[in-house]
């Protein structure tokens, strides 16, 4: 008698169905929030970049109920922190006024804090893109320039008369400037080159680098353009948007995230144990929503 739960092909007398990879690595992705429209937004290139490398993307919700994340985080094999609006300057001890800053998104910032604390604690592979890299730096004790065009000398060290366009007007799938890769960094080894042409869509950037991170790339003007954490398996951030080149020379960045996520699940580094983010009184167990110099 055939097992009623067997695959349809087997029930029909055919060969048992073969599943090449029954568990794709699950990558939790942080969306942007459009507060005025009361909606979450995520550009398709993020999704395509993960799926094209064999990952299963899951868009995470923004909620004040931490029990939701307690249920979701243990299911994630890796995380992707995406680009988006400015980070609240209060998060990195800045009282400078920036008239160009975006409306803060507190729920998104809290989610990103929880992810980074969880990923650091359990060594869960995490990639930060643009704002995601900035949040990574801020969370682990670094600071930001609130507006590069007001606070940073935007010139090419090799061509002083040529200003750097960190917020390009051209199509986002076109590069706007080069970055210099640190060859002995994980990113430099993955890309196997000294200079990389990247796009650029940001007006903020790393000012003081977190003591837990090391630079992996610099812009022509000396701005830190990529970071990584030496004592974690895969904790990396890039200031540009590699998802627009994910089917070209930057696919290796997403492949590394997905492969490390799969390895983390196999090794047991990603915990499936019940997770408590909040205490019984509703306070935050890990106190990760206040930025600190020490983790």
What is the role of each PLM region?
Residues 1-129, 137-145, 149-197, 203, ...:
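N-terminal beta1-alpha1 cap of cysteine-dependent amidohydrolase-like domains
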Residues 133:
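The feature captures the ABC ATPase H-loop/switch
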Residues 236-239:
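Active-site-proximal beta-strand elements of phosphoester/diester hydrolases
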């Amino acid at each position: 008698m055939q097992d009623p739960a067997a695959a349809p092909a087997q029930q029909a007398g055919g060969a048992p169905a073969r599943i090449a990879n029954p568990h794709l690595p699950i990558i939790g992705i942080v969306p942007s929030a459009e507060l005025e429209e009361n909606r979450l937004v995520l550009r398709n290139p993020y999704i395509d970049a993960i799926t094209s490398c064999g990952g299963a993307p899951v868009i995470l919700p923004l909620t004040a109920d931490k029990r939701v994340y307690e249920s979701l985080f243990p299911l994630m094999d890796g995380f992707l922190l995406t680009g988006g609006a400015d980070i609240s300057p209060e998060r990195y001890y800045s009282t400078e006024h920036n008239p160009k800053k975006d409306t803060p998104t507190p729920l998104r910032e809290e989610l990103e804090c929880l992810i980074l604390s969880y990923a650091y604690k359990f060594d869960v592979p995490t990639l930060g893109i643009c704002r995601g890299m900035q949040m990574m730096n801020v969370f682990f004790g670094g600071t930001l320039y609130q507006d590069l065009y007001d606070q940073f000398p935007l010139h090419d060290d090799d061509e002083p008369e040529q200003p750097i366009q960190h917020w390009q007007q051209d199509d986002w799938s076109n590069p706007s400037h080069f970055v210099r890769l640190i060859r002995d960094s994980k990113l430099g080894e993955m890309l196997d080159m000294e200079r990389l042409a990247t796009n650029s869509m940001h007006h903020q950037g790393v000012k003081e680098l977190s003591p837990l991170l090391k630079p992996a790339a610099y812009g022509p003007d000396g701005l830190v353009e990529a970071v990584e954490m030496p004592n974690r398996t895969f904790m990396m951030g890039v200031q540009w948007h590699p998802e627009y080149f994910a089917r070209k020379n930057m696919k290796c960045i997403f492949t590394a995230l997905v492969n490390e996520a799969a390895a983390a699940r196999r090794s047991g580094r990603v915990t499936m144990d019940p997770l408590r983010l909040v205490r019984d009184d509703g306070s935050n167990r890990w106190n990760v929503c206040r930025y600190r110099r020490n983790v």
